[in-house]
Amino acid sequence: MKILIFGLPGSGKSTLAEPFADLIGGVWINADQVRSHYDDWDFTPEGRMRQALRMRYLADGVVLSGKIAVADFVCPTEQARQEFAPDYTVWMDTIKEGRYEDTNKMFEQPPHCDYHVSQWFDNTHEQLVEVVRHYMQRQADEKPDQVMVGKMHV
């Protein structure tokens, strides 16, 4: 399973993603760490699509290894989100503007998300575990031949 936690810079993506990934036995993939590793700080539309693809490949590798991938990155456009191809999306809608004007201008509100965080609570990551668990249970009921991975066995 590939989970995308996205939103404007400063919205709490990493603050949610790291403890959430730990709680579910998943692998946290942080966009800033990935950009640093590849020394790619290009935030043009092309650079952002390259980052979405890079994040997708890393997350797909995690899933192929039998774990849940939890990726957090801005992913500002619907095209970038589709390129990443998540199984589950979490929109961190906790701020109206981030610290980068170019990102604010290009950020597209999603037409759909699986979980919408509009206010941060100290236990948001724990609440998300239960929501994802129910989602995975519904998926298992619809497709009983699929195997759940990580700590998220249902």
Feature names for model-found ranges:
Residues 8-9:
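The conserved Walker
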Residues 5:
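Hydrophobic anchor at the beta1->P-loop junction of P-loop NTPases
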Residues 82-83, 92-154:
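Small-molecule kinase domains that catalyze NTP-dependent phosphoryl transfer to phosphate-bearing small molecules
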Residues 24, 85-87, 112:
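Short, structured coil segments at secondary-structure junctions
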Residues 17-58:
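Conserved substrate/cofactor phosphate-moiety recognition/catalytic segment
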Residues 45-100:
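Glycine-rich phosphate-binding loop used to anchor ATP phosphates in small-molecule kinases
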Residues 2:
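Walker A (P-loop) ATP-phosphate-binding motif of ABC ATPase nucleotide-binding domains
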Residues 13:
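Conserved lysine of the Walker
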